[in-house]
């Protein structure tokens, strides 16, 4: 019997079990053709048994701010505040958090007028008549430039200290998984009755970059002692009398929240769940999704362990499956939206920010030691195999 292994603390090295991230696990893999003049890439097919992933999403809500991804018009990115006394009531989803919840925000600034710095603000509001304490358990926020540019990386790299990443989202999530809270984030916020606190005031500068494009990814785990509402907003840096830029104040963020509309431009409108005509458009997520974690033991049916496959055989478990991409399992893992804007995604496709904690209790049924390889793959998105 091989001891149980947690895939997120140890990944062994020569394969017969395949675990695929970002859209699932499968056997088909096709590189993207980036230059039309080059020959079409080959389609690699590997025979494998694809299984439905056991378990389910937990009930911890996730504030998911990802639409619009490319911000050119300042405004409200995502607000779960009550719509009362707001100039644009439809921009506020009226969803309160209590206890543990997570916050994910991912937005870009692209060629802004006069290269002005775009700020992303995150607000928390206490609607009650008693103080509320919000603990910031872990938190990280990174810019694409210079913190975490997108770069091609080897298929497998050791990263004992979190030094391997490509893009700000990967680096932020890596920090949170390591239990890090960056110094820019407070250990806790004490919010007085009826008051609003500023959790984040993050600039996305583009001036001085070779291309005036930059982005920011933020991931935070929070725990509140009472009900709170949350919002993310985008605002171009206010200017001082001398023309220089400064960070927005809490009061300026509140004014935008109370009087502003949704930031723009808006992303593509998604295909309804019952839509059957035309291309399937997922849309981008802006809302509150149900579930921040997925725990499971990968075992054979009616068993307590997973028998090592015969030599040359492969077992795959699908991760982050979604509508139109269940990889033959008919299982949709995408988180349900508890609150969303009408022009944004119906489900949290891709499950960004969801922590998969998978245990594989392997059982060696042979009479000799066996070497098992565990790998994460990104296959072609298919619904049927």
Language model regions located:
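N-terminal, Lys/Arg-enriched amphipathic/low-complexity engagement segments
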Residues: 40-98
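Terminal connector regions
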Residues: 206-249
């Amino acid at each position: 019997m091989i001891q149980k292994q947690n895939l997120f603390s140890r990944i062994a090295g020569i394969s017969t079990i395949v675990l695929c991230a970002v859209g699932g696990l499968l056997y088909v893999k096709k590189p993207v053709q980036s230059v039309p003049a080059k020959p079409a890439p080959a389609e690699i097919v590997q025979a494998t048994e694809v299984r439905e992933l056991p378990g389910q999403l937990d009930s911890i809500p996730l504030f998911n701010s990802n639409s619009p991804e490319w911000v050119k018009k300042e405004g409200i990115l995502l607000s779960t505040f009550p719509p009362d006394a707001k100039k644009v009531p439809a921009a506020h989803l009226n969803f309160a958090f209590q206890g543990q919840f997570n916050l994910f925000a991912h937005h870009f600034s692209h060629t802004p007028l006069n290269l002005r710095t775009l700020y992303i603000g995150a607000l928390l509001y206490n609607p009650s008549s008693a103080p509320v304490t919000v603990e910031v358990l872990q938190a990280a926020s990174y810019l694409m430039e210079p913190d975490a540019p997108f770069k091609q990386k080897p298929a497998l790299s050791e990263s004992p200290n979190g030094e391997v990443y490509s893009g700000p989202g990967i680096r932020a999530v890596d920090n949170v998984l390591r239990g890090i809270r960056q110094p820019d984030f407070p250990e806790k916020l004490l919010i007085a009755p009826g008051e609003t606190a500023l959790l984040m005031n993050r600039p996305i500068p583009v001036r001085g970059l070779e291309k005036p494009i930059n982005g920011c990814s933020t991931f935070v785990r929070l725990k509140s002692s009472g009900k709170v509402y949350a919002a993310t907003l985008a605002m171009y840096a206010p200017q001082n009398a001398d023309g220089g830029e400064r960070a927005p104040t809490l009061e300026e963020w509140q004014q935008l929240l109370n009087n502003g509309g949704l930031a723009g431009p808006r992303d593509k409108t998604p295909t309804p769940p019952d839509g059957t005509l035309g291309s399937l458009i997922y849309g981008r997520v802006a809302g509150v999704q149900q579930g921040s974690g997925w725990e499971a033991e990968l075992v054979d049916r009616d068993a307590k362990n997973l028998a090592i496959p015969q030599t040359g055989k492969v077992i795959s478990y699908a991760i982050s499956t979604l509508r139109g991409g269940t990889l033959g399992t008919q299982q949709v893992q995408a988180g349900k939206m508890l609150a969303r804007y009408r022009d944004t995604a119906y489900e949290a496709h891709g499950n960004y920010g969801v922590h998969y904690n998978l245990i594989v209790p392997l059982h060696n049924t042979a009479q000799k030691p066996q070497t098992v390889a565990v790998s994460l793959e990104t296959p072609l998105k298919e619904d049927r195999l």
